[in-house]
Amino acid sequence: MVIWFFYGFRKIMHLSLKRIIVKCKMSQLDRTSLIQYFNSNGVLISPEALDKLIKYSSSSLIEDLIKNSDGYIDEKYVERYVSRPKVRNDYEVYLPDVRFNASIEDFRKMFVSKYEKLSKIITSSSSMRGSISIKTAKRSQGEVKVVGMVSEVSMTKNGHKRIVIEDLDDSITAIVMKDRGPVNEIILEDEVIGIIGSVSQSSKDPVIFVNEIIRPDIPYRVIDEEKHEPVYVASISDIHVGSKTFRKNEFEAMVRWISGSDPDASRVKYLILSGDVVDGIGVYPDQENDLEILNPLEQYANLAEYLVDVPEDVKVFVMPGNHDTVRLSEPQPVFPGKIRDLFEPNVAFLPNPYNLKLEGKNVLVYHGMSLNDMIELIPGANYDSIGKAIEAILVRRHLSPKYGGNTPMIPSAVDYHVIEEVPDIFITGHIHSHYIGNYKGVRYVNSSTWQSQTEYQKMMNFNPKPSKLTLFDLYSRSVIVKDFDTTL
């Protein structure tokens, strides 16, 4: 009983310290509170050392100093401690350098990047060996294999499908006859496809009659169940802190669960928040009427305070979405420093989208604005059955296959929406639904929201599926859902 009480007291004191730091990061750290905290732990600290600690604003650093000190901490001790080599993490974060450009040449480079990356994937498949350029195909007879980006799709008056594709040098019309299987395939403008067919020179301009359409697609993956203790990646999205409809009690219950004694909770090593972590302001007309917290920086400070209860050995990754305080156009950058500084050291920040490396596994994280477009473009896809839209993205190996629509894009020399590496796990959000699927061995989720039904959703007759925590085991096929929805 004495041991339990002592451990519980230290844990409570540590959480209160973290809250002191989070609350004070927006202004000046409370020197008096920190001195009292050191004194309560039997440690004296010099004024110079205190200045150093206030600069770093890290509760984990303070705890480590107290744990390893001999009762007195001076400035040199702090400097030696913070300069020690850091332990290597089991994750990698690389931040691409994406600058805002808007010239015609920048758009051209982006489409060239998309074509070259996806063309390389398509031509590496055995069925596309011997592919040639469109210019060469137009001079050929018989069967050809070409790769192109779709610029036009239409139906002829006779019910045939007409597709215009282009590569870096030329374009050609391809016809899918109405009695051929590929006529039923959904072809989107701007996607990159391979075509196997026969060239006809009978008309003024050569035409390819299509026998087969080849997509970049995801190869079938065999998940080797490793003999390894479970390591869980926990996924949530669309928290919307600051909104009057933010489900605060359920979010706190979820964080308490991660910090608790449940065996599954103890296996959570990573927590991913895939965008719209706050509600923001000015996102839509009269939004201020729906807000409990008007200041976006205060919204992030509140989120940071909720996350202090997440154990320090759990790495938290936070990504922006369309409600967050970054540019709307994708790829979205990480949060600015004034927001990042509000959070604890175990919180890392990702751009949107991002391919995260966790213990040798690829975890592709995307907020998911393009899912609205895919629902409109893919027959059978809807907000309650978002899996068809997600799988259409994986088939096309691009997070936003059709340019434009509801997904604004930044033109850049590199197209960061191409899915170059096959993911082990694919995480999305944005829709406020919850859907788990498996496509050719790629486990995916449309992560649950932590916001109740909004007035707009009522008008659209959409019922969100809130307050669900999805756990993926990195070393097996296991997927677990923890439901914190108290309205069921």
Curated annotation (Swiss-Prot):
GO molecular function annotations of the record: DNA binding; DNA-directed DNA polymerase activity; single-stranded DNA 3'-5' DNA exonuclease activity
Any Pfam family matching the protein: DNA_pol_E_B
Catalyses which reaction(s): DNA(n) + a 2'-deoxyribonucleoside 5'-triphosphate = DNA(n+1) + diphosphate; Exonucleolytic cleavage in the 3'- to 5'-direction to yield nucleoside 5'-phosphates
GO terms of biological process kind: DNA catabolic process; DNA strand elongation involved in DNA replication
InterPro entries cross-referenced by the UniProt entry: DNA_pol_a/d/e_bsu, DNA_pol_delta/II_ssu, Metallo-depent_PP-like, Pol2_small_arc
EC number(s) reported in the record: 2.7.7.7, 3.1.11.1
Keyword annotations from UniProtKB, A to Z: DNA replication, DNA-binding, DNA-directed DNA polymerase, Exonuclease, Hydrolase, Multifunctional enzyme, Nuclease, Nucleotidyltransferase, Transferase
SUPFAM superfamilies for this protein: Metallo-dependent phosphatases
KW Ligase (keyword) present: no
Signal peptide: none
Single GO cellular component term: DNA polymerase complex
Function comment: Possesses two activities: a DNA synthesis (polymerase) and an exonucleolytic activity that degrades single-stranded DNA in the 3' to 5' direction. Has a template-primer preference which is characteristic of a replicative DNA polymerase.
Subunit composition and interactions: Heterodimer of a large subunit and a small subunit.
Entry similarity comment: Belongs to the DNA polymerase delta/II small subunit family.
Protein name, per record: DNA polymerase II small subunit
